[in-house]
Amino acid sequence: MLLRRGATEVVAVDVGHGQLAWSLQQDERVKIHDRTNIRELTAEMIGGPVDVVVGDLSFISLRLVLDPLLAVTSEDGDLALMVKPQFEVGKDKVGKGGVVRDLDLRAEAVRSVLDAAAERGWGARAVTTSPLPGPSGNVEYFLWLRHGPGSVDAAAVHDEVRRTASLGERSDKVGP
């Protein structure tokens, strides 16, 4: 999608190997960093800070990778991160089939990432529910972060989660 929308270069980072779609692997605008742990990523590894970071991570909390993600983002850059509650709330709070059904836990997951970003000087400009549920049926959320104070608070996160209580239900964006 980034390339279709005009990105001149995309840096793809994956701890695995060969996970990227074949057509993207063949695209000269895509710089692939397979077998790279995101926690060890530096701006030097990818040619300097970037203007936009898009994160869709699994099996790890975004709170654990915020520092390296922010370190590769330019001061006036943007982050669009997918918050997956099942990886944020802790294994003991995940329900049957790996799905987080409790609305308060979903909101807690988003707020925990929002709070971790705020502690580092980055604020949420918007939060919205993904129109597609995760493979197991989890409702997932996108956070848009920028350096400086955010315009999305805990109440807005709570409202967004409540508005989209049904799995896979699409919502309107919260924020500017």
What is each PLM-predicted segment?
Residues 1-6:
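Conserved SAM-binding loop of SAM-dependent methyltransferases across substrates and taxa
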Residues 83-102:
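Short, glycine-/aromatic-enriched active-site segment of Class I SAM-dependent methyltransferases
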Residues 20, 84, 137:
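Residue-level signal for inorganic ion chemistry
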Residues 8-64:
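S-adenosyl-L-methionine
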Residues 106-120:
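Short alpha-helix
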Residues 63-80:
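A short glycine-rich, Lys/Arg-flanked "PGG" loop and its adjoining helix->strand segment in the class I
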